[in-house]
Swiss-Prot record:
Changing S11A: Impairs histone H3 phosphorylation and reduces transcription of some GCN5 regulated genes. The nucleosome is a histone octamer containing two molecules each of H2A, H2B, H3 and H4 assembled in one H3-H4 heterotetramer and two H2A-H2B heterodimers. The octamer wraps approximately 147 bp of DNA. Histone H3 is a component of the UAF (upstream activation factor) complex, which consists of UAF30, RRN5, RRN9, RRN10, and histones H3 and H4. The modification N6-crotonyllysine is found at K10. Belongs to the histone H3 family. The gene is HHT1. This is Histone H3. Core component of nucleosome. Nucleosomes wrap and compact DNA into chromatin, limiting DNA accessibility to the cellular machineries which require DNA as a template. Histones thereby play a central role in transcription regulation, DNA repair, DNA replication and chromosomal stability. DNA accessibility is regulated via a complex set of post-translational modifications of histones, also called histone code, and nucleosome remodeling. Gene3D superfamilies: Histone, subunit A. The modification Phosphoserine is found at S11. It comes from Saccharomyces cerevisiae (strain ATCC 204508 / S288c) (Baker's yeast). Present with 213000 molecules/cell in log phase SD medium. The keyword rRNA processing does not apply.
Length: 136
């Protein structure tokens, strides 16, 4: 049997289009609500990582000065009334407190990562303090 030449035919692109479900059709035909655009949102964790990088780069104090000063004075009241503080003493206390807290949170984060978690918990802080030899 001799071969015959095939002629070009218009293709329909494969499968025939399926009928839409009633719910999809209703959703598509419903008018949009005035074209109000949703505000942009970053994926969970993106902003947190950005803040971590920003605060690790910075050197300024993160706790506000006046609330910290009030707290120091309130704690000192338990030991002796009418104590006076130099502003440099409060500043030195605040520097050391923030350095302590940052290192504690670093150790706490390592404990959480060791437990295959990304969220720090109370038990991580307890473990970090116990490993440091602090009381609790």
């Amino acid at each position: 049997m001799a071969r015959t030449k095939q002629t070009a035919r218009k293709s329909t692109g494969g499968k025939a289009p399926r009928k839409q479900l009633a719910s999809k059709a209703a959703r598509k035909s419903a008018p949009s609500t005035g074209g109000v655009k949703k505000p942009h949102r970053y994926k969970p964790g993106t902003v947190a990582l950005r803040e971590i990088r920003r605060f690790q780069k910075s050197t300024e104090l993160l706790i506000r000065k006046l609330p910290f000063q009030r707290l120091v004075r309130e704690i000192a009241q338990d030991f002796k009334t009418d104590l006076r503080f130099q502003s440099s003493a409060i500043g030195a206390l605040q520097e050391s407190v923030e350095a302590y807290l940052v290192s504690l949170f670093e150790d706490t984060n390592l404990a959480a990562i060791h437990a295959k978690r990304v969220t720090i918990q109370k038990k991580d802080i307890k473990l970090a303090r116990r490993l440091r030899g602090e009381r609790s």
